[in-house]
Amino acid sequence: MGYLSKFIGVIAAVMLLSATMVGAEEKDPLKPRVPPDQIAEAKAMKNPVANTPENVAKGKALFEGKGTCFNCHGKEGKGDGPAGAILNPSPRNFTNCKFHKKRKDGELFWVIKNGSAGTGMVSLIPAAITEEEAWTIINYERSFCKGE
């Protein structure tokens, strides 16, 4: 029972961890997280906070502070924050420009307000941030897309 059983146990743990990490990657980053019966209403919502450099800076402060978004999405918005490492599926990667072209501000707001079933995304309004702060954060999230 000595070294061989320990070795087999370590190999099994490494294989399980590897499979978990591969499975943690988001399968379809363009898939909406708003339920089908609510998506039209979410898409119709317009961001009341102007997308100005000042508001983007405020959004960054909220993303990295009060909103705690960086914990899962990472400071660079890549979905690689310290808490995001254990989530399956992984948090959204806001540097994915295809995601930003596909999803409307109202959809992002809906997820911030209601959370997203089957993911680690919890409702942040009103427990952590206000509706206005959520819209401000969305302006900052949009700034992660640098082209494409």
Question: Which stretches of residues belong to each language-model region?
Answer:
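N-terminal export/targeting leaders of redox proteins
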Residues: M1-A44, E148
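Electrostatic cytochrome c docking/interface patches
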Residues: P32-E64
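Short glycine/proline- and charge-enriched loop/turn segments
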Residues: A40-K43, I86-N93
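Short microdomains enriched in Cys/His and/or Lys/Arg
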Residues: P91-K102
